[in-house]
């Protein structure tokens, strides 16, 4: 050890002396003595590492209290931090998918703060069923005989298969053997459910005769899977749900469908691309239909199954149902969201997902231009700020080839160095409320479609 290093080490303060500093007294009151002492020990270790490696004191040496405060605040932040989603993907899986309506937020808060009638029948003063209230709503909206709720749509598919076709064959078109995020594959789910996959048709063409020829004494289900996260175009042929349901009736084989994203309203009335609706499949005679709660429906993560009463009863009595059941917060949020669908005239205003999807390009562009003028003074020395047209996507595997015209604020470094974009994006990710955009074509793009809280955005961007 050199004499210079030894001198620097000697300048490091003792923990006891720091603890008696007035600034540290307030930190001890807020975070507790033990946590502050543990932090100071780590800070001293960090300081020794800096001295050993650089022969200098750390840059925060002059204000230990401020550095400790920053570290304690960072450690106290929730792992689930609010962010500003300007990626251009409305239902961003990594950012939590659908934002909840105010009614859903209030319902969840109430369910957390007080005992609720989760499985209690007020009329009979005995045990009730946790799905009952939602089943009534879902039947009213979809026209189904009954309904079942689990914790996500993957669970819904697993439960449908395990409860109705374990040990039997399930007939599916080869072009519908989907894989979604996290390597969730229909063939794997079938195997886990104890079913045998029977593929029919080809990747791009499947005919009604393929299903008929596949049926044998061990056939348990005919299954239709909506390819919500990819599209096959060109020389194609599929069997529609109504036709498949007719085949099922002829051969006395139940037909089930996995809709994936599942919209409860006709999106085309809002100028959006059409998606198949559960009520259409129920009307066509499909026995069971599953779909997600947190995609186009705009509610919490949940798996929803609607259909024939007798088959729903099979699901409810299966051991997996208890393992996969939804909790009271999910049920509270989902019920509040479904009630919004009873007043369709106000849905686009009250349901955040639909509100964001239906924003006009003109209103988004006006917002971007207005905010660009205010941000130019802050970033103009290093970056050229422009408002450019762009295309948003719905996300979460919904309508994969369809895009929504939007507008973005773009940041292009004057010196053309891509590293400046990476540094800027990293800086925004470290903000108290991170701002998340995307880097593309030599620019950092902030798609403004999902920006509703302008004041919070500007507060972060001007830090």
Curated annotation (Swiss-Prot):
Cellular compartments annotated: Cytoplasm
Keywords: Cytoplasm, Protein biosynthesis, Pyridoxal phosphate, Selenium, Transferase
Chain positions found as N6-(pyridoxal phosphate)lysine: 295
Catalytic activity annotation: L-seryl-tRNA(Sec) + selenophosphate + H(+) = L-selenocysteinyl-tRNA(Sec) + phosphate
Cofactor entry: pyridoxal 5'-phosphate
InterPro entries the record matches: PyrdxlP-dep_Trfase, PyrdxlP-dep_Trfase_major, SelA-like, SelA_trans, SelA_trans_N_dom
Gene Ontology biological-process annotations: conversion of seryl-tRNAsec to selenocys-tRNAsec; selenocysteine incorporation
Major subcellular site: cytoplasm
Pathway annotation from the record: Aminoacyl-tRNA biosynthesis; selenocysteinyl-tRNA(Sec) biosynthesis; selenocysteinyl-tRNA(Sec) from L-seryl-tRNA(Sec) (bacterial route): step 1/1
GO MF annotation terms: L-seryl-tRNA(Sec) selenium transferase activity
EC numbers on record: 2.9.1.1
Coiled coil regions in record: none
Xref: Pfam families: Se-cys_synth_N, SelA
GO CC terms, sorted: cytoplasm
NCBIfam families reported for this sequence: selA
Family: Belongs to the SelA family.
Subunit structure: Homodecamer; pentamer of dimers. Binds only one seryl-tRNA(Sec) per dimer.
Function: Converts seryl-tRNA(Sec) to selenocysteinyl-tRNA(Sec) required for selenoprotein biosynthesis.
Protein name stated in the entry: L-seryl-tRNA(Sec) selenium transferase
Organism from which the protein derives: Salmonella enteritidis PT4 (strain P125109)
Classification of source organism: Bacteria, Pseudomonadati, Pseudomonadota, Gammaproteobacteria, Enterobacterales
């Amino acid at each position: 050890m050199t004499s210079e290093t030894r001198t620097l080490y000697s300048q490091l303060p003792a923990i006891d002396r720091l603890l008696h500093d007035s600034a540290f007294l307030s930190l001890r009151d807020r975070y507790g003595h033990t946590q502050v002492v543990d932090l100071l020990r780590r800070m001293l270790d960090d300081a020794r590492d800096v001295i050993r490696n650089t022969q200098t004191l750390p840059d925060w040496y002059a204000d230990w209290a401020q550095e400790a405060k920053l570290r304690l605040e960072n450690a106290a932040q929730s792992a689930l931090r609010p962010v500003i989603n300007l990626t251009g993907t409305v239902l961003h899986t990594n950012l939590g998918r659908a934002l909840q309506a105010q009614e859903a937020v209030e319902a969840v808060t109430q369910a957390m703060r007080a005992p609720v009638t989760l499985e209690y029948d007020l009329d009979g003063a005995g045990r009730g069923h946790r799905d009952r209230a939602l089943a009534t709503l879902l039947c009213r909206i979809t026209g189904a005989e009954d309904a079942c709720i689990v914790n996500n749509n993957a669970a819904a598919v697993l439960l449908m298969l395990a409860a109705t076709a374990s040990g039997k064959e399930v007939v599916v078109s080869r072009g519908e053997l989907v894989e979604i995020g996290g390597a969730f594959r229909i063939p794997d789910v079938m195997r886990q459910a104890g079913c045998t996959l029977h593929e029919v048709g080809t990747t791009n063409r499947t005919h009604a005769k393929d299903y008929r020829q596949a049926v044998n004494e061990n056939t348990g289900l005919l299954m239709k899977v909506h390819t919500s996260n990819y599209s096959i175009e060109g020389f194609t042929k599929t069997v529609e749900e109504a036709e498949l349901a007719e085949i099922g009736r002829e051969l006395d084989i139940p037909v089930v469908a996995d809709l994936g994203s599942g919209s409860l309203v006709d999106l085309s009335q809002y100028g959006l691309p059409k998606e198949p609706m559960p009520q259409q499949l129920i009307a066509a005679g499909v026995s069971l239909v599953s779909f997600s709660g947190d995609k186009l429906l705009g509610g919490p993560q949940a798996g929803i199954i609607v259909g024939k009463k007798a088959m729903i009863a099979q699901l409810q009595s299966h051991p997996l149902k208890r393992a996969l059941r939804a909790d009271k917060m999910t049920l509270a949020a989902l019920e509040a969201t479904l009630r919004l669908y009873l007043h369709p005239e106000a849905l686009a205003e009250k349901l955040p997902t639909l509100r964001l999807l239906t924003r006009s390009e003109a209103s988004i562009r006006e917002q971007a231009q207005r905010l660009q003028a205010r941000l130019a003074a802050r970033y103009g020395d290093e970056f050229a700020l422009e408002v450019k047209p762009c295309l948003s996507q719905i996300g979460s595997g919904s309508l994969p080839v369809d895009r929504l015209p939007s507008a973005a604020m773009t940041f292009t470094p004057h010196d053309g160095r891509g590293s400046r974009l990476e540094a800027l994006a990293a800086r925004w990710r470290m903000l108290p409320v991170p701002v998340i955009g995307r880097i593309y074509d030599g620019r950092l793009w902030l798609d403004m479609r999902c920006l509703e809280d302008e004041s919070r955005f500007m507060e972060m961007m001007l830090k």
